[in-house]
Amino acid sequence: MNKQTAHYHLPGLFEFYELYRIFLPLFREHREYFYDGCDIGSIYGAPPDCIWGGGRVSLEDHDAGEVLALLQEYGISARLTFSNSKLIEEHLSDRKCNELCALFAENTEPENGVIVHSELLLQYLKSHYPQLYLISSTTKVLTDFEALKKETDREDFRYVVPDFRLNKAYEKLNTLTESQKDKVEFLCNECCYFGCKDRKECYEAVSRRNLGEEPDFSCTSPGAEEGYRFSKAMKNPGFISVGDIQKIYLPMGFSNYKIEGRGLGSALVLEFLLYYMTKPEYQLQVREEIYLDNMLDLF
């Protein structure tokens, strides 16, 4: 990948198929609408009822074959979000998750990947689906810089997503080697309370829900009842703006940027695409192209 290019890893592989069905042709046919030096590195997600799933509970679904066909048409990598941290041996035989991995492994141009947390699942995927590259999930909550370094040194992972609270540790981040920097994928637009001490427990609760359990957990962070708001995320100390990417991170040698949003609506994800990828003078045109498509229900 070109290091002077910001590679965005976008949410909603299954959830926002209809949005991407409209957006991707615009991105290809009207490059003048979009910033120079940005592209789509991957789109990630998982269908509902995937017990290997984690990070967020998926509510929307779309046919996996159609999803893959769309991304192949545009040369974009598809990633399965299988970041459940609570898997045990008996879960590895799950038919739906294995069928998805087998389908994604069939397509090698471009390569597809899996976002993973569980070491048990990691070893299983390496053994059964070696065609799929692996991403270390942000659900590991890597807030310790030395732990991040060790994770980037692991040959198992092509990319590593640290906790968003390491985003502004510029001096430490700049000590990483070129190969380590190539692996780091920053989570840009997290809205979670910066001082949250329960982030790992929150992700574990999602993992348990995907396994059919009812964990006794509720978020008590300040402002949690408001839900996700992009305006609030922009005020987060860990927020990475489009200006930060262009003026700080790319010059430092970092190229990969994850945009969260799987559990949100299409309209808000569109705002992310406009903010991070679209030149301000063309944002209204892109928004109109999307809104005026009668096949897309944004709200």
Which role fits each region the language model picked out?
Residues 1-147, 151, 157-299:
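Active-site pocket-lining/capping segments in soluble small-molecule metabolic enzymes
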